[in-house]
Curated annotation (Swiss-Prot):
Localization, UniProt: Cytoplasm
Catalytic activity, as annotated: (R)-4'-phosphopantetheine + ATP + H(+) = 3'-dephospho-CoA + diphosphate
Protein name: Phosphopantetheine adenylyltransferase
Gene3D superfamilies hit by this protein: HUPs
Pathway(s) of this molecule: Cofactor biosynthesis; coenzyme A biosynthesis; CoA from (R)-pantothenate: step 4/5
Class of enzymatic activity (EC top level): transferase
GO cellular component assignments: cytoplasm
EC number: 2.7.7.3
Residues that bind ATP: T11, F12, H19, G90, L91, R92, E100, Y125, S126, F127, L128, S129, S130, S131
Species name: Listeria monocytogenes serotype 4b (strain CLIP80459)
């Protein structure tokens, strides 16, 4: 049996401490973890895909088994091209579960070989979202406890 490979998809606009917590914990379980940065067509991004990928690379540099790539199309198809047997999703609250369960069921229908793993976020991040970070920063609120330092600097620069 080869490496245990997983994909953790997301918009990561920007990456938060909650995202990083899930990535670090998944990196302990899987031999290779692809962080796939997606463009969400229903959201207007603050950062380009390239900017998001660079921030993620910087904040995951201490995790040698993490690779950062951009992806488009179906996550389950992307996972298959990477030889992944798992998709990792973070759950903040019960409210996330129903939506994530629907996606997991659809992915299972599309490719039964790829499992979905849910990791519960650390309770101190259960309220945290990229949207919330952007909203607080837009009004000059302090986001230093919500995102890694390099991300804080980049977000602040966008709202100057």
């Amino acid at each position: 049996m080869g490496d245990k490979i997983a994909v953790i998809p997301g918009t990561f606009d920007p990456i938060t401490n909650g995202h990083l917590d899930i990535i670090e914990r998944a990196a302990k379980i899987f031999d290779v973890l692809y962080v796939s940065v997606l463009n969400n067509s229903s959201k207007k991004p603050l950062f380009t895909i390239e900017e998001r990928m660079e921030m993620i690379r910087q904040v995951t540099a201490h995790l040698p088994n993490v690779q950062v790539e951009s992806a488009s199309g179906l996550t389950v198809d992307y996972a298959a091209t990477r030889g992944a047997t798992a998709i990792v999703r973070g759950l903040r609250a019960v409210s996330d579960f129903e939506y994530e369960m629907q996606i997991a069921s659809m992915n299972r229908t599309l490719n039964a070989e790829i499992e979905t793993f849910f990791i519960m976020t650390n309770t101190k991040y259960s309220f945290l979202s990229s949207s919330m970070v952007k909203e607080v920063a837009q009004y000059q609120g302090d986001i230093s406890e919500l995102v890694p330092e390099i991300v804080n600097e980049q977000v602040q620069a966008k709202f100057k």
